[in-house]
Design a protein with these regions (language model features):
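Domain-level recognition of nuclease-like catalytic cores that cleave nucleotide substrates
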Residues: 3-7, 87-173
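Structural signal for conserved beta-strand scaffold positions within catalytic alpha/beta enzyme cores
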Residues: 29, 54, 90-92
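Short, charged, amphipathic alpha-helix that recurs within catalytic cores of restriction-modification
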Residues: 63-90, 112-115
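Short acidic/glycine-enriched loop/turn segments that link adjacent beta-strands
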Residues: 34-37
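Surface-exposed cleft-lining segments at the edges of enzyme active sites
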Residues: 3, 58-61
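Conserved catalytic cores of phosphodiester-cleaving nucleases, focusing on short active-site segments
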Residues: 20, 40-42, 49-59
Length: 173
């Protein structure tokens, strides 16, 4: 099962890189968590934009990003002072197959493939240190802390290859 998940992640990362690489953008897959770097770095040198991207894909209702992976993205972004616009992006891909359990057996049902690209701000500097960030299939995002989960509205980032962004109204509790 681990290899399937890992391959799913690599495929999603390569998909993002290949869609980003064009006349204006250059993107590279860096190897991710095993080497202490973001999954992907992308730059637009004409507009001085740098993206540090952490990518997650899966068949469940929720995808999670541990805080250490987000912190690595911020540490890389801080290194590049030349870039006027620097963003840490969490990329989430919910696959067409939704994994469900029936009588302790995994099964799949069909659903629409969706992708979200969320701009993450260094929220833990405001006193909340999350253990991880969670994104649900509907695009809602949450900080997971020792005290529980807090819904937070991270802005969508329009990737250069996206035609439109689906917006969701998120209510704070």
């Amino acid at each position: 099962m681990g290899n399937i998940r890992r391959n799913r992640g690599y495929n999603y990362e390569y998909s993002i890189v290949s869609r980003l690489n064009n006349r204006y953008w250059t993107a590279k897959r860096l190897g991710g968590s095993s080497v202490g770097l973001p999954d992907i770095i992308a730059v637009n040198n004409n507009k001085a934009i740098l993206l540090a991207i952490e990518a997650k894909s899966g068949t469940g209702e929720s995808l999670y990003v541990p805080s250490d992976q987000i912190e690595r993205c911020f540490s890389i972004v801080k290194m590049f002072r030349y870039y006027k616009y620097k963003y840490v992006i969490l990329a989430f891909k919910f696959l067409r197959k939704k994994r469900i359990k029936i009588n302790n057996k995994s099964s799949y049902e069909k659903r629409k493939l969706v992708e979200y690209y969320k701009i993450i701000e260094p929220i833990w500097k405001k006193g909340r240190i999350p253990q991880q960030i969670k994104c649900n299939y509907d695009g809602k995002t949450f900080l997971i802390t020792n005290q529980g989960s807090i819904e937070i509205n991270f802005c969508d980032y329009k990737m250069p290859f996206q035609k439109k962004i689906k917006k969701y109204q998120i209510k704070y509790k």
